[in-house]
Amino acid sequence: MTAPVYDYSDDVMDFDEVLEHFDPVMGMEVHVELATKTKMFSTSSAEFGDAPNSNVDPCSLGLPGALPVVNKLGVEWAIKIGLALNCEIAPKSRFARKNYFYPDQPKNYQISQYDEPIAYDGYLDVVLEDGTEWRVEIERAHMEEDTGKLTHLGGADGRIHGATASLVDCNRAGVPLIEIVTKPIEGAGERAPEVAKAYVSALRDLVKALGVSDARMDQGSMRVDSNLSLRPVGTTEYGTRTETKNINSLKSVEQAVRFEMQRQAACLVNDVEIVQETRHYQETDGTTSKGRPKETMADYRYFNDPDLPPVLAPAEWVEEIRATLPEMPWIRRARIQEEWGLKDEEMRDLVNAGALDLVVDTVEAGAKPDEARSWWVSYLAGKANEQGVELSGLDITPTQVARVASLVNEGKLTTKLARQAVDGVLAGEGDVDEVVAARGLEVVRDDGAIEAAVDEALAANPDIVEKYRAGNKKVTGAIVGAVMKATKGKADPAQVNQLIAKKLS
């Protein structure tokens, strides 16, 4: 009797219970869009965000007779990524046609690489939250072209199911991609979700450092597919895997792996068949939902593209590219940690929060390292959490944060007023100085007004005055609070404390 096919159920297994029975095996596939000016096989612009179907040409539309021409810079950047991932670079690689029908694929095949990728057998060492280092082995990194983009209309969740119409934008068709595929990641156990997140984070940092991609997961220039299967503890045979597609944030990577472990475990203990399929990650509740059956390699009918010659990468050219590699992110982190005098856990907090580059840019814009860290890791991290976005997705720049810090140092803003200024920038009210002026946030400089507020607060709190004069100097906080309330937070606390001490001496 055939086991029932499992789609989705809220009856997932408790995560700790999963680990008692099963070991997870993961595989990560990450697509990185290269930031070249033109497409991989034609001269059309690869600019993101242009009007739909404005960056198209006969080749990216798959018109009869159109012939592809390889973008040399795309090949160079593919080699650069391979070298940074400690891969072997193939002296000769080939493009192949991956055949499948989908409306966003005008040619009905995708130019990719199959059995002769440009880079293979590498690794990337990643650091987990507690400082543990984990080596993720790379199977291959290969070149291919991106597909177009579909916009589904009429459905409840923007997906094709339930849609009444679909719009095709071919601007993205032909944009150069590098797909980076890991070898099976085994032995991670309870840390599998964390390892997946750390790997994607490290890979994102790497390609950004290389200058080959902005790696914006929210815009699709870096897209993550996670493959996962479970096997009983103590066994070695792989289970049936599922592939969760197009995960678009680090948090979602972790949640998708965790949920799929719990879902598959519930299937296995209830004798429900796990189908090899693609699944969609649901941002709203952190679950995955059924997609389509997963094709095998044979289904794609790969064959060498007859319109494209082999890609040759002589050793001399590879070494020239190697010489252009920038400081790697892990080396840069060690240097910054030493220069700023940070403890290991302080540096990990910066990296785990996705704040390191933002803090570095804020320091370069004029802020002190401790000021920049404080803003990004505490207050702005809280704002990002409230909005459900990553730090880099906030509508404030490092230059603006540095300006806020400067105004605090100049005594023109208190910390409380500075936070209000930041809130205004995040709300789209303008640049820092515009928000300060529009909201009237600058610290009050009228000595007479502040002194009057101090006198009023002292008169209203004779018991505090008495305690102070009896030797308890810590009671002035209530007086300072009253003055700040009277001045709507615009008085300089240091000036207020000086006035209080002077009047009570």
Curated annotation (Swiss-Prot):
Catalytically driven reaction(s): L-glutamyl-tRNA(Gln) + L-glutamine + ATP + H2O = L-glutaminyl-tRNA(Gln) + L-glutamate + ADP + phosphate + H(+); L-aspartyl-tRNA(Asn) + L-glutamine + ATP + H2O = L-asparaginyl-tRNA(Asn) + L-glutamate + ADP + phosphate + 2 H(+)
EC number: 6.3.5.-
UniProt-recorded Gene Ontology molecular function terms: asparaginyl-tRNA synthase (glutamine-hydrolyzing) activity; ATP binding; glutaminyl-tRNA synthase (glutamine-hydrolyzing) activity
GO biological process, one term: glutaminyl-tRNAGln biosynthesis via transamidation
Keywords: ATP-binding, Ligase, Nucleotide-binding, Protein biosynthesis
Coiled coil: none
A Pfam family matched in the record: GatB_Yqey
Entry-linked Gene3D superfamilies: 1.10.10.410
Enzyme class name: ligase
SMART domains documented for this protein: GatB_Yqey
Xref: InterPro entries: Asn/Gln-tRNA_amidoTrfase_suB/E (IPR017959), Asn/Gln-tRNA_Trfase_suB/E_cat (IPR006075), Asn/Gln_amidotransferase (IPR018027), Asn/Gln_tRNA_amidoTrase-B-like (IPR003789), GatB (IPR004413), GatB_Yqey_C_2 (IPR023168), Gln-tRNA_amidoTrfase_suB_CS (IPR017958), Gln_synth/guanido_kin_cat_dom (IPR014746)
HAMAP family the UniProt entry points to: GatB
Family designation: Belongs to the GatB/GatE family. GatB subfamily.
Subunit structure: Heterotrimer of A, B and C subunits.
Function as written in the Swiss-Prot or TrEMBL entry: Allows the formation of correctly charged Asn-tRNA(Asn) or Gln-tRNA(Gln) through the transamidation of misacylated Asp-tRNA(Asn) or Glu-tRNA(Gln) in organisms which lack either or both of asparaginyl-tRNA or glutaminyl-tRNA synthetases. The reaction takes place in the presence of glutamine and ATP through an activated phospho-Asp-tRNA(Asn) or phospho-Glu-tRNA(Gln).
Protein name: Aspartyl/glutamyl-tRNA(Asn/Gln) amidotransferase subunit B
Species assigned in the record: Corynebacterium jeikeium (strain K411)
